[in-house]
Amino acid sequence: MRILEEDLKRGLVKLRVDNLNDIYWLASIIEEGDLITMKTLRRVKQEGIRADSGERIPMILTIEVDKVKLDPYSSRLRISGVVRVGPDKFGIQGQHHTFSVDEGSSLTIVKKEWRKTHLEILKRAESMSEKGEVLLVAMDDEGATIAKAGSMRVEEIAYIRSRLPSKMDTRGREGEERRYFSEILDTLRELYSKIKPRAIVVGGPGFFKDRFLSYARAKDPEMGEKMREGDASNATFSGVLEMIRRGEADKVLRELDLAKDMAAVEEIFELLSKNSDLVTYGVDEVLEAVNQGAAEIVLISASVFFDPDMRDKVFSLIEGCERTRAEFRIIDSTSEPGEKLDAIGGVAAKLRYRI
């Protein structure tokens, strides 16, 4: 996320959405009654033509929000409301409109009051955008899984199957290996141009990954500089996750916080397994610990963080963490650590002392 303009005296913040994680953050701060301005397409009815068949015309509108809808498995945020400002010639003031926000969208938010929590969320989102993403490749002589790791999630993007003949067919195998490597490299080039990853980590069993790295660095020296060697026991998505758990991509993943998320959740479960007094879970229990200043680190799953019904309690948690200098982390609910956290209610805390 990029904050393009900030004028809190007018209650105005203009920003640009850079990636999917930004959409999640945005969904947590836009509320009913906010004024949102952005460029959009609006179907305009022409004389004598059905309303649903008019021309879609680009325009800039301002709506007063009455509904925000986020599909956790979608890449779009839908913001609905009543049009308050728009081109006079179309006569659409007072009508409903829905903005569709995705990667690359720019919008202006005007609030009656920007809470400290809102600003903390924006600050965190902007900070995470600066850290970028990393591509991971788990490969062997049968196939390659390519995934993207961001600040909160790991997403499988492609699986490329090799068609290598038997090792007895030396000439045929060499030709097919070049084709296989070329397809992987072309896919990485396309992704590289789109997301500008901080690094590309390539892992897998045996020496096959080494041959690919040599090939890729020779064919594309610029992208080759971003490539690092990892280690995984297989070429599936579990191999990608294995690289993260083993710390193979740690030099970049520590920037993206994903490895820290895994470690933090594992520490919670280790304390729980020992019946330790230095851990608690559940929204109300954690909020009480935070208010007493006992919480050292608070973990909140995305499913809880972005639940409209939990907004007030979540904001109270974040404000309490700021006040008592406790660390808080948002854990992606679609990730392995997020699923584990959701299994115990989606909120947990490691404590500084017993309460």
Curated annotation (Swiss-Prot):
Its EC number is 3.1.-.-. Its cofactor is a divalent metal cation. One of its GO terms (cellular component) is cytoplasm. Keywords: Cytoplasm, Endonuclease, Hydrolase, Metal-binding, Nuclease. SMART domains: eRF1_1 (SM01194). It is found in: Cytoplasm. Signal peptide: none annotated. GO terms for molecular function: endonuclease activity; metal ion binding. It comes from the Archaea. One of its GO terms (biological process) is nuclear-transcribed mRNA catabolic process, non-stop decay. May function in recognizing stalled ribosomes, interact with stem-loop structures in stalled mRNA molecules, and effect endonucleolytic cleavage of the mRNA. May play a role in the release non-functional ribosomes and degradation of damaged mRNAs. Has endoribonuclease activity. PANTHER family: PELOTA, PROTEIN PELOTA HOMOLOG. HAMAP family: PelO. Monomer. The N-terminal domain has the RNA-binding Sm fold. It harbors the endoribonuclease activity. Belongs to the eukaryotic release factor 1 family. Pelota subfamily. This is Protein pelota homolog. The lineage of its organism: Archaea, Thermoproteota, Candidatus Korarchaeia, Candidatus Korarchaeales, Candidatus Korarchaeaceae.
